[in-house]
């Protein structure tokens, strides 16, 4: 599991999270994968590219999980 620390921000947009954690090569690829329903947030399919991810949430994609702290 990848741990992503929010630091000083309240949230990060879903497509940006996939990019900065290295699970996607670019934001464009991340947006496409999200739109195709391949990304889960807290166990539910998420299709909103700009979904606000906050501390305590779990994002899953391609058998990888990101814990946002």
Regions found by a protein language model. Name each.
Residues 1-12:
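A detector for short, charged/polar N-terminal pre-domain segments
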Residues 12-52:
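A basic, amphipathic helix-loop patch mediating RNA/tRNA/ribosome contacts
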């Amino acid at each position: 599991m990848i741990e992503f620390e929010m630091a000083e921000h309240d949230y990060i947009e879903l497509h940006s999270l996939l990019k900065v954690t290295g699970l996607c090569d670019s934001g464009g690829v991340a947006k496409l994968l999200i739109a195709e329903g391949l990304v889960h947030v807290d166990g539910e399919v998420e299709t909103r590219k700009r979904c606000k991810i906050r501390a305590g949430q779990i994002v899953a994609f391609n058998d990888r999980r990101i814990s946002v702290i």
